[in-house]
Regions:
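Conserved "landmark" site that anchors the functional core of diverse proteins
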Residues: 11-15, 36
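Histidine-anchored nucleotide/phosphate-binding helix
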Residues: 17-34
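Long, highly charged amphipathic alpha-helices
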Residues: 22-26, 53, 153
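Hydrophobic alpha-helical positions that pack around
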Residues: 37-151, 157-164, 172
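Ferredoxin-type iron-sulfur electron-transfer modules and their immediate structural context
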Residues: 125, 151, 158-196
């Protein structure tokens, strides 16, 4: 799943552009662990740079295929991906396993690679910092940020808050929640920090 469900978060696509090999190795390890014979990389068609990067590294691998999906919300949700690739609708109570699928994102796949090759546990998180940031409006992509790192430190690393702001949303604009900047820290569930 390279379809960033939340529109402001870009770290999964950024990881794919930066290091497609770590992700492909993660796919291969996941296929071996689950016994899967085929893997599909679901990605929005608009992400041309990431698509080119992954296709370059897939040459010769017949069991991993790229599927370009529409740029619409909530295309990144696992049930929507399964429907887009296989045409199967899952009930709200059903999980991907009910369709004989496992859906993993780029960060999870890179963590699988690090666990297998380096014996590294998941002790950090990839984060997108975006919004009213002095470092510019473009998303700031931070990789392997230690869990427990204050969000305030990440915002400062990206240039700091640009003037007055409304709130800091941890996560994405649709599923994130506002948190107190003085107490917010990176958790295993953090995906982004949005300064509004």
């Amino acid at each position: 799943n390279y379809v960033e469900c939340e529109p402001a978060l870009h770290h999964n696509i950024g990881l794919l552009e930066k290091d497609p090999e770590i992700v492909i190795r993660g796919i291969e390890y996941a296929m071996e662990a689950t016994g899967a014979k085929k893997a599909y990389i679901a990605i929005k068609g608009k992400n041309k740079k990431a698509i080119a990067a992954i296709k370059k590294h897939l040459s010769g691998l017949k069991n991993i295929e790229v599927r370009e999906l529409k740029d619409m919300y909530p295309m990144g949700e696992e049930r929507a991906i399964i429907h887009a690739i296989f045409g199967n609708w899952l009930e709200p109570t059903q999980l991907p396993l009910d369709a004989k699928c496992v859906v993993l994102n780029a960060e999870t796949l890179s963590n699988i690679t690090r666990a297998v090759e380096d014996r590294k546990p998941v002790i950090d998180k990839d984060i997108t910092v975006v919004g009213k940031i002095k470092g510019g409006n473009a998303p700031h992509l931070l990789y392997e940020v230690p869990i427990g790192t204050p969000i305030k430190n990440l915002i400062e690393e990206c240039g700091g808050i640009d003037g007055e702001y409304g709130e800091v949303v941890i996560g994405g604009p649709y599923t994130g929640k506002a948190e107190d900047l003085e107490n917010a820290v990176v958790t295993k569930m953090s995906g982004g920090a949005i300064v509004t």
